[in-house]
């Protein structure tokens, strides 16, 4: 099983990129190959998922471990294959996706290729409440000097900083922090789940 590849991006096509490492060119399927265009001709690190079938072995590539974990979560949903999962996260912005799942917004989910209403409902059924832990564990951040988290418990502070790293604004977070602070003794994951629920109401 491969975790990542580090090499030179030599080729970019509408469906895949080629990364050369150790004088071998690896064809890697990505959601948006052209997002690697700025890296063409330079060394890049691409996180990998190896998909094995009887007649084919494919490598799927991601720019972050967060994208890869979401891809794997989507693969666990009945009716979602690798190509569909890749298309869902191809936009590169996972915040609306997570928010749609948490708020049961099947209309938003049906905008993705190969996702009808039945599949959208299945995604919500299988993944609602199960993505916050992935987000919390996969986002790497450095805690800044931030007045917004002053005086909060370590668990709530970690949750707020993770949500901030996801792209939620200070204004959005300040609205929910007082409500979160009333809930004592929650884990960071639980605070994130609760915050997502509050912000999508």
UniProtKB/Swiss-Prot annotation:
Which GO BP terms apply? DNA recombination; DNA repair; SOS response
Cite the SUPFAM superfamilies for this sequence.
DNA helicase RuvA subunit, C-terminal domain (SSF46929), Nucleic acid-binding proteins (SSF50249), RuvA domain 2-like (SSF47781)
Keyword annotations for this protein? Cytoplasm, DNA damage, DNA recombination, DNA repair, DNA-binding
Q: Does the keyword section mention Cytoplasm?
A: yes
- Provide the residue span(s) of the region labelled Domain II: 64-142
Broad class of the protein's primary localization: cytoplasm
GO MF terms here are: ATP binding; four-way junction DNA binding; four-way junction helicase activity
Q: Residues annotated as region Domain III? A: 153-201
Oligomeric state and partners? Answer: Homotetramer. Forms an RuvA(8)-RuvB(12)-Holliday junction (HJ) complex. HJ DNA is sandwiched between 2 RuvA tetramers; dsDNA enters through RuvA and exits via RuvB. An RuvB hexamer assembles on each DNA strand where it exits the tetramer. Each RuvB hexamer is contacted by two RuvA subunits (via domain III) on 2 adjacent RuvB subunits; this complex drives branch migration. In the full resolvosome a probable DNA-RuvA(4)-RuvB(12)-RuvC(2) complex forms which resolves the HJ.
Protein name in UniProt:
Holliday junction branch migration complex subunit RuvA
Q: Which organism is it from?
A: Listeria monocytogenes serovar 1/2a (strain ATCC BAA-679 / EGD-e)
């Amino acid at each position: 099983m491969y975790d990542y590849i580090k090499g030179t991006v030599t080729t970019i096509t509408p469906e895949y990129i080629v990364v050369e490492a150790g004088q071998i060119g690896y064809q890697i399927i990505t959601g948006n190959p052209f997002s690697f265009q700025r890296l063409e001709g330079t060394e890049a690190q691409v996180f990998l998922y190896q998909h094995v079938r009887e007649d084919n072995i494919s490598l799927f590539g991601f720019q972050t471990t967060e994208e890869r974990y979401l891809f794997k979560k989507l693969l666990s949903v009945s009716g979602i294959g690798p190509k569909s999962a890749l298309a869902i996260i191809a936009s590169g912005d996972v915040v609306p996706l997570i928010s749609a799942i948490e708020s049961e917004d099947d209309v938003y989910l049906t905008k993705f290729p190969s996702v009808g209403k039945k599949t959208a409902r299945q995604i919500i059924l299988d993944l609602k409440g199960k993505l916050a832990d992935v987000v919390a564990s996969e986002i790497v951040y450095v805690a800044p000097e931030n007045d917004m988290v002053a005086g909060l418990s370590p668990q709530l502070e970690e949750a707020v900083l993770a949500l901030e790293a996801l792209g939620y604004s200070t204004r959005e977070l300040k609205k929910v922090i007082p409500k979160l602070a009333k809930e004592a003794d929650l884990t960071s994951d639980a605070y994130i789940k609760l915050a997502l629920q509050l912000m999508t109401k």
